[in-house]
Amino acid sequence: IRLGLVGSEMCIRDRCNGCQVLSELKEIIPGTEGWPCLKRNISNQFEARLVQLKVNNSKSIFFHNMEDSQLVVPVAHGEGRMEFSDSSHLEKLFLNNQIPLQYVDSKGDIATSYPSNPNGTTDGISSVCSSDGKVTILMPHPERAFLNRQLSWTNNEDQGFSPWFEMFINARKFVN
């Protein structure tokens, strides 16, 4: 059985619980070989706070023109650690540009430990995408940070969009 929902003009981006569900459905989603399973955070706690992410050059249609950005985003999960069944799967995902987002520390280095890496995922990975870039799963919540006023350190009167809004623009461009 293969999931036929992802047609030539359709894309899927799911975060948090949707990320967990889609990672379990990887066997029926084309181009998701080597995707991880989601496991309990290393901290054994629900993590609900802000973290920093680096946007990588990837095949994900959602992050075009965002490469090398370092952005703050909320996380809210207890089971967000991406566990790969084989290190060769992880290597292949990196080689194929299927790792759109990674947690980084305050210096911009890949976060390999808590608290900058809120769940303990290898190499700070917070997102993977399908080989064609149409399906992307991620644990963080950029939908909670696409308006400047959603970010506590910004001027609440700033009615503009944050850099995360580009993700939604990219999806719109893809389907048009």
Where are these regions (language model features)?
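Glycine-rich, phosphate-binding/catalytic loops in enzymes
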Residues: 29-32, 154-156
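Hydrophobic or amphipathic alpha-helical targeting/insertion segments
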Residues: 13-31
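Generic recognition of cysteine residues
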Residues: 11, 16-19, 37, 129
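Single conserved hydrophobic/aromatic residue that forms the stacking wall/gate
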Residues: 1-7, 12
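Short acidic (Asp/Glu) patches
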Residues: 30-40
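Amide-donor transfer/coupling interface in amidating biosynthetic enzymes
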Residues: 38-176
